[in-house]
Amino acid sequence: MSAQGKRLMVMAGGTGGHVFPGLAVAHHLMAQGWQVRWLGTADRMEADLVPKHGIEIDFIRISGLRGKGIKALIAAPLRIFNAWRQARAIMKAYKPDVVLGMGGYVSGPGGLAAWSLGIPVVLHEQNGIAGLTNKWLAKIATKVMQAFPGAFPNAEVVGNPVRTDVLALPLPQQRLAGREGPVRVLVVGGSQGARILNQTMPQVAAKLGDSVTIWHQSGKGSQQSVEQAYAEAGQPQHKVTEFIDDMAAAYAWADVVVCRSGALTVSEIAAAGLPALFVPFQHKDRQQYWNALPLEKAGAAKIIEQPQLSVDAVANTLAGWSRETLLTMAERARAASIPDATERVANEVSRAARA
């Protein structure tokens, strides 16, 4: 059956880890002739980002329940019901053939609305530990996929859809073989930065001296203070930027990455074929630890959990990796990646729409 005229509604919101993989799948299916709309919330990143990609977006009112107190919990059933009713009205008007839930609060009422209308629900879990919304929706979903093994016991492991410019990078052997001079260390704390990395890495630079050159993404509002920290450590030569717009270029430059281990970051690093030193964000589910673990087990990365993080721990780890070791780790990272994740997710969406 032709994809021409098929309609998809993507449900994803809140963070780049949910939105960017959804956009990758949306563009893949749009290139095949699908119509795509988005279900999101008006006060999160998808509200601005999705329309820039040429995709119309509908909004419902919903937010998270964690840490909101007893009053919010009492009001939650009514809020979820209202959001479900809004999503149901949107879907009755749009009539999607299938909905794709990529996570975020919006997927909960959106998935329930689709199910109540008899529309197939396809889920993708980006993290190594399933989010609360996807745990609930998995019971009614037509198909459940996961990026890393372990989030769901029987779900297919398909990887995370990542940006095409990252997938297009030369293989590690072509990129890294023959490199000389200081080891190029890319420090990434996510779009918000990571205070612990901003505090630690200037001191690491002082310990390692001329053996490294660092490109440090500080996050919003931190560039000046991080530059000052490098200068005070006697290392003013290192590059500090608030954001990195072209992550593919940054990955191509780097020999090794020091970063948090959000799901999309881990998947991009594997797809790029880069060794990594992961410092997982401390979360009660240890979500980022479980995201990073497959690459550590593959011999492509090392995890230092935040309570054990120190200047010496980072400096000694980086100093212990020769260029030969870094190339081996990079090749293992690339071998552990699933470069056709976007196509795999898109194929399951197509299959569910035909069922």
Swiss-Prot record:
Q: In which pathway does it act?
A: Cell wall biogenesis; peptidoglycan biosynthesis
This chain is encoded by the gene named: murG
Q: Which residues does UDP-N-acetyl-alpha-D-glucosamine bind?
A: 15-17, 127, 163, 191, 244, 263-268, 288
Q: Which UniProt keywords apply?
A: Cell cycle, Cell division, Cell inner membrane, Cell membrane, Cell shape, Cell wall biogenesis/degradation, Glycosyltransferase, Membrane, Peptidoglycan synthesis, Transferase
Q: Which InterPro entries match?
A: GlcNAc_MurG (IPR006009), Glyco_trans_28_C (IPR007235), GlycoTrans_28_N (IPR004276)
Provide the primary localization.
Answer: membrane
Recorded GO MF terms: UDP-N-acetyl-D-glucosamine:N-acetylmuramoyl-L-alanyl-D-glutamyl-meso-2,6-diaminopimelyl-D-alanyl-D-alanine-diphosphoundecaprenol 4-beta-N-acetylglucosaminlytransferase activity; undecaprenyldiphospho-muramoylpentapeptide beta-N-acetylglucosaminyltransferase activity
Its recorded reaction(s) are: di-trans,octa-cis-undecaprenyl diphospho-N-acetyl-alpha-D-muramoyl-L-alanyl-D-glutamyl-meso-2,6-diaminopimeloyl-D-alanyl-D-alanine + UDP-N-acetyl-alpha-D-glucosamine = di-trans,octa-cis-undecaprenyl diphospho-[N-acetyl-alpha-D-glucosaminyl-(1->4)]-N-acetyl-alpha-D-muramoyl-L-alanyl-D-glutamyl-meso-2,6-diaminopimeloyl-D-alanyl-D-alanine + UDP + H(+)
Q: What's its job?
A: Cell wall formation. Catalyzes the transfer of a GlcNAc subunit on undecaprenyl-pyrophosphoryl-MurNAc-pentapeptide (lipid intermediate I) to form undecaprenyl-pyrophosphoryl-MurNAc-(pentapeptide)GlcNAc (lipid intermediate II).
Upper lineage ranks? Answer: Bacteria, Pseudomonadati, Pseudomonadota, Gammaproteobacteria, Enterobacterales
Q: Name one Pfam family in it.
A: Glyco_transf_28
Q: Which family does it belong to?
A: Belongs to the glycosyltransferase 28 family. MurG subfamily.
Instruction: Tell me the membrane topology, using the record's own terms.
Output: Peripheral membrane protein
**Enzyme Commission number:** 2.4.1.227
What name does the UniProt record give this protein? Answer: UDP-N-acetylglucosamine--N-acetylmuramyl-(pentapeptide) pyrophosphoryl-undecaprenol N-acetylglucosamine transferase
Recorded GO cellular component terms are: plasma membrane
Q: Which GO terms describe its biological process?
A: carbohydrate metabolic process; cell division; cell wall organization; lipid glycosylation; peptidoglycan biosynthetic process; regulation of cell shape
What is the superkingdom listed in this entry's lineage?
Bacteria
Q: Which residues cross the membrane?
A: none
Q: Where in the cell is it found?
A: Cell inner membrane
